[in-house]
Amino acid sequence: MRSIYDQEMRDIQRDSIHMCNLASETLQDVMDAVRRRDFTVVERVLEQDQRIRSMRMALNERVMRMIATQHPVAVDVRRLFYIIHLADEMERIGYQAAAIGRCILRTQYGKVLLLEDIYRMSERTATMFERMLASSLNESTDAVRNVLTMDDEVDVLYEQIYRECITRQSGLRSQDSDVMTAVNVAQYIEHVGDHIVNWARWWLYFVGEQDSDIIV
């Protein structure tokens, strides 16, 4: 029975990492689609979003079944609850990527204003994601504060893009769809950063970090 229990724990952890990798790939794909105006890639992003949602549901069911039937020890219960919250954040990141994709599909010719600024935002969030994944794989907290600092940088970039878009819109009589697309895409990327911060906080919960200025 113990071997079955250990194998199930390994399988759940493996699948949670697979979900993280798919969410990361989806983010990269959608930003490549934005830069290249590639609508076929957007369709793949929407499909990947659905896969992530299905994976989250399946993973949560397995975790709850294991808690109910296997009576895991305290440290494993803590890990399993962390995995549930991790899966939730990955689903939300997939949702944000899909939302960016839908923005591009609605935009004539796939034009996005302030593309370089938006891409800098996405690169920051991609780095945040990579560092959090490395921290969880290494069971380390070394990168967490760096991730939080980078999220502050993402927020600053979003505010800059937002102000620039408002300035551009203010001189127009009607709403400019290209301006609104830039605002929306930047906002979705900013939300991705927030989800990675949530991931960081749940990771600290799992490892037992009691730093009150991070865990809120």
Spans of model-derived segments:
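Cytosolic, long alpha-helical scaffolding segments
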Residues: M1-V216
